[in-house]
Amino acid sequence: VPVSHGKIVDNSRIARVIPTIEYLLEREAKIILLSHFGRPKGQYDPSLSLAPIVDALNKFLPKDRPAKFCVDCIGDNAKEAVAKLRSGEVLLLENLRFYAGEESNDEDFAKELAMLGDIYINDTFSCSHRSHASISALPKFLPAGIGVLFQEELSNVEANLMKPERPFAA
């Protein structure tokens, strides 16, 4: 999500994951959102916090179910925030890249994330090539599936590869 001076410049990436969130909300799921932002190199950087994303996210959510934000993505703060989460609520965890384990694909980091949920849904086809803990290691520890956006993007790739318009250039 593009941010300038702490303000979101373009919320289209947030809008694109809303169908998956709505699908889960309709089923009264407890939704824990994981994401990354910038390149903090495993260190906390307040300018790369996901906190401003919550306000943008809430513009798309029902007014009576605003998303909550947790100042961490693992540890006691995250466990406590998840424990307080009720069915049909959304929780955004802090930037995964504040921990070196995210980009190093650390399985212990992934296990800590896995302890917070029951099912893993990947809705980021565009990031799925990365060998990061939240993408590569986490699905080893939870049943996994794909979200609405991922399915749409996968369908587009399949359509273009299986039935490309001619002439076709790669």
Which residue ranges define each predicted feature?
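Active-site loop-to-helix "anion-binding N-cap" substructures in soluble metabolic enzymes
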Residues: 1-170
